[in-house]
């Protein structure tokens, strides 16, 4: 994502890397000291939020009271680095000041078939942090590109191809014709599936990709794993 505020150009990149098993976000600015941010969490479920050095940690147990006892415990770690800026950790947030580049590494684990999920979460983040952003990205591209490039789709471009994505959406809602946007969404869906469901994933992606807890996504079904007409 590219955008400009005033005379500063910002670039944001995000990818889920299977080889390193983390989410990686990078934000850069064309001007020094242009990135100032406070990273905190607003959780939908009860959880404890703390900091450990440059890491923001959240952990708890997911319960579904209406469905009886059960649920998995989880821990997530968000590691933050800003080489040309400063970090300030508080009880439940980390501030980034006067940076021109910000990198965030995220891993989340549950105790589903893994009692050592907390130590694995920490080890995974620490290991990824030791690699440069360029190395993480290159490894990711080498892994997923051969899979992604198996399919291509050409439907034409249309007159709105040069607009930002949100502006293209606006034109389509007004009745505009933009087949290139259909291609973009098709390939985006493929990328999400490749990022969330691989041969070494603990569980495959569900029908809509995520479990519905009636908080993050309020639908009339739970989107869980069960046998019904979909198996046909």
Predicted regions located by residue number:
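Aromatic-residue-lined binding/catalytic grooves and analogous aromatic/hydrophobic interfacial grooves
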Residues: 2-232
């Amino acid at each position: 994502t590219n955008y400009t505020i005033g005379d500063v150009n910002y670039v944001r990149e995000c990818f889920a890397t299977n080889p390193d098993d983390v989410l990686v976000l990078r934000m850069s600015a064309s001007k020094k000291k242009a990135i100032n941010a406070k990273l905190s969490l607003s959780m939908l479920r009860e959880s404890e939020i703390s900091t450990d050095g440059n890491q923001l940690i959240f952990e708890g147990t997911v319960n579904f009271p209406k469905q009886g006892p059960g649920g998995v415990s989880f821990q997530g770690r968000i590691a933050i680095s800003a080489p040309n800026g400063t970090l300030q950790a508080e009880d439940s947030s980390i501030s980034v000041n006067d940076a021109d580049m910000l990198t965030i590494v995220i891993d989340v684990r549950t105790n589903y078939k893994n009692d050592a999920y907390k130590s694995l979460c920490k080890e995974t983040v620490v290991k990824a942090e030791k690699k440069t952003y360029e190395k993480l990205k290159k490894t990711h591209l080498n892994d997923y590109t051969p899979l992604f490039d198996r399919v291509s789709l050409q439907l034409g471009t249309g007159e709105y191809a040069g607009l930002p994505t949100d502006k293209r959406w606006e034109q389509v809602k007004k009745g505009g014709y933009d087949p290139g946007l259909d291609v973009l969404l098709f390939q985006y869906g493929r990328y999400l599936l490749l990022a969330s469901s691989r041969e070494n994933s603990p569980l495959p992606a569900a029908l809509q990709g995520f479990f519905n807890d009636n908080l993050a996504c309020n639908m009339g079904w739970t989107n869980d794993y069960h046998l019904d007409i979909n198996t046909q």
